[in-house]
Amino acid sequence: MAKRTKKVGIVGKYGTRYGASLRKMVKKIEISQHAKYTCSFCGKTKMKRRAVGIWHCGSCMKTVAGGAWTYNTTSAVTVKSAIKRLKEMKDQ
């Protein structure tokens, strides 16, 4: 079998349509949404995207809400770290 894509990867399905810069942006998004992420409950790399913002772990069968294209958004990480810091300050 011949190798199909060398540079374009997952966005090869769009062919020459829509322009190179738009396809590069879409490539970054599609790679992140199809990737498997580490589950925050069981620690295994089984977290997959089911729908927009819905993530499901195939190991522990937990379903959680997350980002549209990635499991954790930057704002969610910031909020979690702030909550953790406030809990530590309260305990002291």
From Swiss-Prot:
GO terms for cellular component: cytosolic large ribosomal subunit. It is found in: Cytoplasm. SUPFAM superfamilies: Zn-binding ribosomal proteins. Its main location: cytoplasm. Component of the large ribosomal subunit. One of its GO terms (molecular function) is zinc ion binding. It comes from Ictalurus punctatus (Channel catfish). This is Large ribosomal subunit protein eL43. Zn(2+) binds at C39, C42, C57, C60. The keyword Transmembrane helix does not apply. Belongs to the eukaryotic ribosomal protein eL43 family. Transmembrane segments: none annotated. Component of the large ribosomal subunit. The ribosome is a large ribonucleoprotein complex responsible for the synthesis of proteins in the cell. Keywords: Cytoplasm, Metal-binding, Ribonucleoprotein, Ribosomal protein, Zinc, Zinc-finger. PANTHER family: 60S RIBOSOMAL PROTEIN L43 (PTHR48188), RIBOSOMAL PROTEIN EL43-LIKE-RELATED (PTHR48188:SF5). The keyword Cytoplasm applies. Disulfide bonds: none annotated. Gene3D superfamilies: 2.20.25.30.
